[in-house]
Amino acid sequence: MAAAAAGAASAELVIGWCIFGLLLLAILAFCWIYVRKYQSQRESEVVSTITAIFSLAIALITSALLPVDIFLVSYMKNQNGTFKDWANGNVSRQIEDTVLYGYYTLYSVILFCVFFWIPFVYFYYEEKDDDDTGKCTQVKMALKYTLGFVVICALLLLVGAFVPLNLPDNKNSTEWEKVKFLFEELGSSHGLAALSFSISSLTLVGMLAAIIYTAYGMSALPLNLIKGTRNAAYERLENTEDIEEVEQHIQTIKSKSKDGRPLPARDRRALKQFEERLRTLRKRERRLEFIENSWWTKFCGALRPLKIIWGIFFIFVALLFVISLFLSNLDKALHSAGIDSGFIIFGANLSNPLNMLLPLLQTVFPLDYILITIIIMYFIFTSMAGIRNIGIWFFWIRLYKIRRGRTRPQALLFLCMILLLIVLHTSYMIYSLAPQYVMYGSQNYLIESNMTYNDHRGNSSLSVPKRCDADAPEDQCTVTRTYLFLHKFWFFSAAYYFGNWAFLGVFIVGFIVSCCKGKKSVLERVDEDDSDLSDDEPSLYSV
């Protein structure tokens, strides 16, 4: 009997982890295609490419653990609310520990990438731009700058290991007892607290990146698909008129020196500016002519109705997310245990569409896997749309532009770092969208129901299944490791709560801005620093 139970437990684990393995292969393929799509063909470097692919893949693999975690805790129980024969206390704890060790490993690798490997590779290529430095000097300088990131990581680990987690003792309600139980359930070791604090700090940075890029991208992506780009022939006509106008200005300035007199300093500066402007316009002319006559333009024109349909679909998806997030946050504001608990909520008093949909899909395996994968990919694509539209800035200084097929190695590392942090935040975002699903999955537990019969005297007690919630006994429902990891520190949960309101605000502002903006150019912006690039690059198309 024991052997059969162990075999059943192993089978359930194999199912969950096999799907995780398939997701792993799909993630690696996606990251390779994605990075190769944006990296510069002239400046591509093997180390930066591998680093970008690996760091983005690690983040996506970590997010893929979420449905595995939910799948495993849900499969411990039958739909009638009873535990399966093999799911005794030791086996269930072993399954939970398997997921927890997976998180330990992946989160440790993420810390290594964020605080050592990515900064080292970035500074190495920054030093490589200086032709006078040798390999050893580049490595030494890169290590010197990277040391600052290592110190920050060490400080986060130290603070996380010893930061007090004591909740106020002046709360005696049942909900506060449950909050304390959740904080203590994951464990109290200093190593776990240090890792959780460091990852939560990175997730907080990812939340800021999501507010800036993802919230804007959720509105910009669908509206850009619907509006499309400007007509290449019309743009070329406008560009020709601009060339003629600039040539007239140049001719007017040069005519002042026909009699041999030198031009004043102001006219020389103006002449230089007009000549640079003329070079840029002629580059645009050549590229517009190439695009106007290309088969790709005709193919994109044929796909125009499909793009409009996709744009409308993405708007509905964005509205679904926004409505779900608003209702979830409103529920926390009205029914949570308060800011001192990180706005933890038990159960869903205000139902939202995704929180109702995901538990239903989980009953038809693997539909919930598919939906969560779609949600994560949607966040990736909308974040990318936001980054492409806004660029990478340091306060008011624009550091890099992200362009298809023309992104420098340093910009590519920055891009993957931002996406890594945003993907880290998606776990909490999915919890915000579907808190009940992330906490318990599709678990049920048994409650006693009294029934009165008319044909004889007396009452009868009947056990009926009920969806797991805060009212369930502690030994009847298993909380996911993801949920516990997200709520190890209450002050981070409180910050995420306020960040969700900021996310909604930026989405509304971004939607208004995107509606007011006109159509994008058929070309990516052509600048003076593009002179070393081919005039006939298909990567210039704005899709």
UniProtKB/Swiss-Prot annotation:
Motif (YERL motif): 234-237
Any single GO BP term: clathrin-dependent endocytosis
Keywords (A to Z) from UniProt: Cell membrane, Cobalamin, Cobalt, Cytoplasmic vesicle, Developmental protein, Endocytosis, Endoplasmic reticulum, Gastrulation, Glycoprotein, Lysosome, Membrane, Phosphoprotein, Transmembrane, Transmembrane helix, Transport
Signal sequence region: none
Residue intervals on the Extracellular side: 1-12, 74-102, 168-190, 329-366, 432-488
Main localization of the protein described in the UniProt heading: endoplasmic reticulum
A Pfam family the protein falls into: LMBR1
Residues the record lists as Phosphoserine modifications: S531, S534
Residue positions where Phosphothreonine is found in the record: T240
Quaternary structure note: Interacts with ABCD4; this interaction induces the translocation of ABCD4 from the endoplasmic reticulum to the lysosome. Interacts with ABCD4 and MMACHC; this interaction ensures the transport of cobalamin from the lysosome to the cytoplasm. Interacts with INSR, adapter protein complex 2 and clathrin heavy chain.
Name recorded for this polypeptide: Lysosomal cobalamin transport escort protein LMBD1
Organism phylogeny: Eukaryota, Metazoa, Chordata, Craniata, Vertebrata
Gene: LMBRD1
